[in-house]
């Protein structure tokens, strides 16, 4: 069993553009599977977990004792604070960060906040995937990073919970989230695609040419079953119980009973 980590969009492109052989693709945004892998490389997409955007930091971060859910954007835009996020074109956490900033501008009624946050986050603070920011936090080279809650929990970091209206965690706020949009590279070279804000939902799919199909399906069965769900919950990642799949009718028999 081997894993290879990258931003979800990068993972999908390794399959579609580089011909990378793999059994499964797990994405932190289920729509990456829908947009980039189905129908040419995969047939179905199981939605199995949720998450929330948070601001991760350590005790050594500037103003760590002061930052809270009401003043975080004021703290971050002080000239001596370094903050970062992952690359939007490579990693859903990156474009979700930009969505959080847009939603924050509306939620806090702070015109120009998105542009200010964007301008004060230099290119060197934008990394290919969100977990790379952890090293910068732990070394003290970065004060704050926009991360998934599960990543902060798993790395033992402090983190600031953002309001539900902007943290992309709640289906109840889906209508508000939709007001945020980010332009990304499209499926064809030089093309563009627009991502719209949605609650964070993770997806998993089996590739059509999976070389180890039965073992891969056994892993999916474990992941969306009680044991896998319990592990996710302990690691700060709420499972979707039961998992859902729009293509349930074509799922392998092993998975059908575990999916709604």
Predicted regions and their residues:
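A short alpha-helix-loop-beta-strand transition element characteristic
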Residues: 45-48, 109-111
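Short, solvent-exposed loop/turn segments at the edges of secondary structure
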Residues: 50-51, 199
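Exported/periplasmic ABC-transporter solute-binding proteins
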Residues: 5, 9-18, 29-30, 37-38, ...
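Short acidic/histidine-rich motifs immediately flanking catalytic phosphotransfer sites
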Residues: 20-22
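Acidic, polar ligand-binding/catalytic clefts
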Residues: 26-41, 46
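Short alpha-helix C-terminal cap/hinge motif
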Residues: 1-3
């Amino acid at each position: 069993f081997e894993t290879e980590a990258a931003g979800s969009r990068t993972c999908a492109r390794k399959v579609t553009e580089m011909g990378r052989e793999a059994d499964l693709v797990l994405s932190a945004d289920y729509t990456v599977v829908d947009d980039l892998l189905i129908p040419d490389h995969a047939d179905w997409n199981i939605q199995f977990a949720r998450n929330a955007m948070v601001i991760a930091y350590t005790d050594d971060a500037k103003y760590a004792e002061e930052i809270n859910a009401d003043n975080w954007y004021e703290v971050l835009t002080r000239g001596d604070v370094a903050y970062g996020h992952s690359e939007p074109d490579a990693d859903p956490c990156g474009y979700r960060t930009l969505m959080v900033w847009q939603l924050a501008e509306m939620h806090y009624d702070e015109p120009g906040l998105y542009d200010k946050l964007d301008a004060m986050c230099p290119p060197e603070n934008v990394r290919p995937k969100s977990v790379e920011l952890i090293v910068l936090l732990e070394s003290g080279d970065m004060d704050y990073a926009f991360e998934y809650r599960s990543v902060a929990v798993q790395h033992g970091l402090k983190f600031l919970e953002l309001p539900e209206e902007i943290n992309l965690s709640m289906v109840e706020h889906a209508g508000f989230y939709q007001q945020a949009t980010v332009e990304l590279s499209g499926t064809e070279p030089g093309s563009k695609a627009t991502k719209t804000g949605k609650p964070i939902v993770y997806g998993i799919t089996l590739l059509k040419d999976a070389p180890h199909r039965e073992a891969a399906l056994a892993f999916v069965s474990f992941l969306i079953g009680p044991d896998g769900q319990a592990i996710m919950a302990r690691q700060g990642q709420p499972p979707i119980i039961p998992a859902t799949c729009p293509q349930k009718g074509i799922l392998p028999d092993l998975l059908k009973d575990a999916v709604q």
